[in-house]
Each structure stands twice: as C-alpha cells, then as structure tokens.
C-alpha cells in the first residue's frame, strides 16, 4: 500500500521517481481502508530533506500510511521557506486533540545545549506527555530519542571528546525482537553526533532493553515498552550522501572534522560513498509499522483510553 502525502510536497515526485508507492488525496478517498495515522515531528533545519528521508522509509511497506508533518508551535524555521511550512506542516497546538497510531520525533543539531536550555523544551515535554494518551507508538531519533529517554527516565546525554562520525557496525542484541525481524547478526548504521548515552545508565533503568549496540559508539536502539517507545541514537534514515554533505560543509567552514569512519571506500573522500545500511533501514521501519498495525486500535479514538 502507498503512503498518502500531498501531491505538491517535494517528496512526492522524488519518491515516485524511486518507485515508492505514493498517492494523493483523491486516490486515497477512493480506497475503503483505515490507513495508519503517522505523525512526523520534524525538528531538523533542512525540513524537506528530512521529511523525504522518513517518507521514503515508511512508504515502502504493504501498509497504507497517512503522514502528518508537525512542527513546534512557536519555533520558526530559519532554513525552510515559510511557504513550505505553511503549506505542509501543522503546529503541535493544532494536532494535540488528534490520535495517531505512530509518531516519529526527529533529531536536532542542538546537542551542545542542555535540554532545559532548548527554546522549545517546555512544549516538547508536553509532546512527550501527550504521546502517552494520544499516540499508540513513538519513535525518537538521535537527539529526539535522547530527549525522550531523558524526559521519561532521567538518563543523561554525555559530551564526547570527538564527534562520533561515520558508518559503524552494530550488533543485534535481541534477535527475537519483533523490531529486528529479518536483521542479520550485525549491521552498519550511519552515526553523526557529539554526544552519547551510556549503556550502564540505560541498564540501570528497569524495563529498558538495548536492541542494537556498538563497541565503538555505544547503545543505538533501545526499547521502552512502558512508554510504547523506541529510541534510536543513530541515523538509519540518512541518504547515501548525507554524511558527505556534513563533512564537506565542515571542511568548507574550517570546522575541525575527521573523515567519516568506514564511509568512503578506503576512507578516501575523493571516492563516492557506498550505502551499506539501506536494507536494514527499511527492515527496522517496516517492522515498527507492522508492530503498530498488529497492536493498535481499529477505532483510532480508542487509542489511550
């Protein structure tokens, strides 16, 4: 089944050209199916790039998805046009009375800030509380996942001495998990962050289970069944060239940065990088959506009751 997004959203043509099944409102209205209602709270500066990355992953399953793009109510995006935000995004204040089968909360390049110093932290905490009554399952990504696990469990993020940057092998620590169905014993995941969550602090919280982890960059994917949440601290959603864009940007700006580990062939930035995570990215998000489909309420309004 396809993902339903506006035909004028930039991702529509991009995904159509890649063979992803997408459809507009007209076709959706002719189908007698209850689509999964998925929200994407996009905290990244490059909204179009990020919304396309996640739409690509959640639009590649047999399930029909109705995607709602959400922004923080008062925060104004500086890197995406006001016209795009007005046309395609709904402020959280406008959707807080709705119910969703799933919600993805993206990362944000604000790791250097304490959580409480983030300008929209108070509203984001409202979002976290709202997920417990209005959302069946939530997926926090990178900083979004760190913020969620901090809010619900007090687990702190820690500044790294050097940026974790590159493609790192991660071990499958829970082969029986429905979220890792079809996963191999290890997989490569893009990493781009200045902070980490410590495994010992996650292990100290009853009920949390680490599903994927790396000896080099630490825990990656954590399940929190008590809050119907997954937290992932790395970037399965990244395009092939995303790390290259970040590296080239820092080099151009004179920002000290190492060549991303295990990304370019022979670690040579002159060579084109290879995507070694795409299949596992689709598996993870497909498994997450399938688990939602198997466990959510048919009557959307019963979620949280």
Curated annotation (Swiss-Prot):
It comes from the Bacteria. Transmembrane segments: none annotated. The record marks 192 as: Important for substrate specificity. Substrate binds at residues 163, 192, 249. Its main location: cytoplasm. GO terms for biological process: L-methionine biosynthetic process from homoserine via O-succinyl-L-homoserine and cystathionine. Keywords: Acyltransferase, Amino-acid biosynthesis, Cytoplasm, Methionine biosynthesis, Transferase. It is found in: Cytoplasm. Its EC number is 2.3.1.31. The keyword Nuclease does not apply. GO terms for molecular function: homoserine O-acetyltransferase activity; homoserine O-succinyltransferase activity. It catalyses: L-homoserine + acetyl-CoA = O-acetyl-L-homoserine + CoA. The active site is at residues 142, 235, 237. The record marks 111 as: Important for acyl-CoA specificity. Pathway: Amino-acid biosynthesis; L-methionine biosynthesis via de novo pathway; O-acetyl-L-homoserine from L-homoserine: step 1/1. Transfers an acetyl group from acetyl-CoA to L-homoserine, forming acetyl-L-homoserine. Belongs to the MetA family. This is Homoserine O-acetyltransferase. The gene is metAA.
